[in-house]
C-alpha cells in the first residue's frame, strides 16, 4: 500500500452575536462656558430619553464600548471630553472648550451617547 496522509475530519461552526446597548443622556447648559474653560456635567444634571433624572452613568465595557458627545447637535472631536462613569458626585462628563475658539453658550443642548457591546459566541464541533 502506498504512503498516505492520515488526518482528522472535523467540521466546526461558530455563531457570533454582538448586541449593542445604546443609551443617551441629555443636558441643557445654564451658563456660558468660555473658551479655555471646562464644562463639567455631573451624572445628576443629565436626564434620560423618557425625561427622568439620571442617577448613574454606565461603565464603559473594556474594548467593547465608546461614547460620543454632541454640543448643539454637532458631534465633538475625540479628546475634547473626559467621561467618568458612576453615580451622582462621581459620574460626570467634562468638556474642555479649546482656547481661542468659541464658547459653549447658555441653553446649549449637550447629548452624551454611550454604546456598550455584548458579544457572545457558540461553537459546534462535529467529528
Tell where the protein language model's regions lie, with residue ranges.
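Extended beta-strand solenoid/passenger and fiber regions
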Residues: 2-71, 75, 114-126
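Surface-exposed interaction regions enriched in Ser/Thr/Asp/Glu
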Residues: 3, 84-127
Amino acid at each position: 500500500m502506498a504512503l498516505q496522509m492520515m488526518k482528522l475530519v472535523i467540521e466546526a461552526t461558530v455563531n457570533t452575536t454582538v448586541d449593542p446597548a445604546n443609551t443617551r443622556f441629555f443636558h441643557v447648559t445654564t451658563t456660558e462656558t468660555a473658551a479655555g474653560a471646562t464644562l463639567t456635567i455631573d451624572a445628576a444634571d443629565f436626564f434620560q430619553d423618557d425625561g427622568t433624572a439620571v442617577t448613574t452613568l454606565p461603565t464603559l465595557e473594556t474594548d467593547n464600548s465608546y461614547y460620543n458627545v454632541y454640543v448643539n447637535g454637532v458631534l465633538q472631536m475625540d479628546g475634547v471630553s473626559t467621561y467618568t462613569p458612576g453615580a451622582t458626585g462621581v459620574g460626570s462628563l467634562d468638556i474642555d472648550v479649546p482656547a481661542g475658539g468659541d464658547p459653549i453658550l447658555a441653553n446649549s443642548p449637550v447629548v452624551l451617547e454611550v454604546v456598550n457591546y455584548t458579544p457572545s459566541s457558540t461553537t459546534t464541533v462535529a467529528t
